[in-house]
Regions:
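Conserved alpha-helical substructure of the radical SAM core
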Residues: 1-111, 115-119, 155, 219-225
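Radical SAM enzyme [4Fe-4S]-AdoMet core and its adjacent flexible, acidic
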Residues: 23, 28-33, 37-40, 83, ...
Length: 297
């Protein structure tokens, strides 16, 4: 497997975002009830896939992703996970809600994350719940700029920014859930991202589960014209910045259904990835409707 995602703490979060798949299910936020992943479960999964080699003897596993449901920095064993991956020279691909709780909000904590991760994605889904996320991103980027300058041995950190990974320092991305309330702010977001040094924006049109309420749909659902308009503006450069990459499900061939490839597993861009649940069982399909709409209801 190229990447593994550990669902370390899907029920543990410090925010309550309305578009979270657990909230869309129409039940209380913590009904998933699967608990936290024991560290030994995480270790076993990582060591299992880290042992895989390709025909030339090179390790196949490139990175580990801690929970993308819940806030991974609240995982009780996050520091242990970080230490294990560092010892195995496996970078983490981190997605956080931007609150940077506890030690992770201080300069030393951010420096450790930047040295240990391949990419740090800050989800803009939390923007309605937490208005301090931009300030935290700017602080993270300030810490990275200092690291880049040191790594470049006094060279021009700005010119080295695009080579962050080559210097062993994480890139910083935004993960944007596009919906009715924020689609008209895309240009403003791109401008800010470019000015502060964001490397990439992942644009993902909102996915509403079949269990989502009508009220939620009326508040957040996008129509096809809005999605297509933004897609074209980003593709033709009208809404782009030369120093920011644009990726995400907005650019998938078929973004109108839950599965972006229409259920054709042989075309799935995630075919060489696996998701490990807290109890250790494995899941190979990322379709949110299948995964979240009926689990433990």
């Amino acid at each position: 497997m190229r990447r593994i995602t550990l669902l370390t703490n899907p029920d543990k979060c410090n925010l309550n975002c309305p578009l979270c798949f657990l909230n869309q299910r129409g039940f209380s936020r913590c009904v998933l009830g699967v608990g936290e992943m024991a560290f030994e479960t995480a270790r076993t999964a990582i060591e299992k896939y880290a042992a895989e080699r390709n025909a030339s003897g090179k390790r196949v596993l490139r990175e580990v992703i801690p929970s993308t449901m819940g806030e991974p920095l609240l995982y009780s064993h996050f520091e242990d996970l970080l230490s294990l991956c560092r010892s195995m020279e496996l970078p983490l691909n981190l997605t956080t809600n931007g609150t940077f709780p506890g030690k992770w909000g201080c300069e030393a904590g951010m420096e450790l994350l930047l040295r240990s991760c391949s990419d740090i994605k800050v989800s803009c889904l939390a923007s309605e719940q937490f208005d301090g996320w931009k300030a935290n991103v700017e602080k993270l980027l300030d810490v990275r700029q200092k690291l880049m300058a040191d790594a470049a041995q006094g060279g021009d950190a700005a010119n080295s920014m695009l080579n962050a990974r080559a210097l062993g320092i994480a890139t910083v991305s935004l993960q944007v859930t596009l919906h009715k309330k924020n689609v008209d702010k895309a240009a403003e977001l791109v401008s800010w991202a470019s000015s502060v040094g964001i490397n990439r924006i992942k644009w993902n049109p909102v996915v509403l589960l079949s269990t989502a309420s009508q009220q939620l749909r009326e508040m957040y659902a996008l129509d096809d014209a809005q999605i297509e308009s933004l897609r074209q503006e980003l593709r033709n450069g009208a809404l782009s910045a030369s120093n920011v990459k644009h990726e995400g499900s907005l650019f998938f061939n078929n973004g109108k259904v839950f599965c972006a490839v229409g259920g054709k597993c042989e075309s799935c861009p995630f075919a060489d990835e696996v998701w490990v649940w807290p109890d250790g069982h494995e899941d190979h399909c990322p379709d949110p409707e299948r995964r979240w709409s009926k689990v433990h209801t």
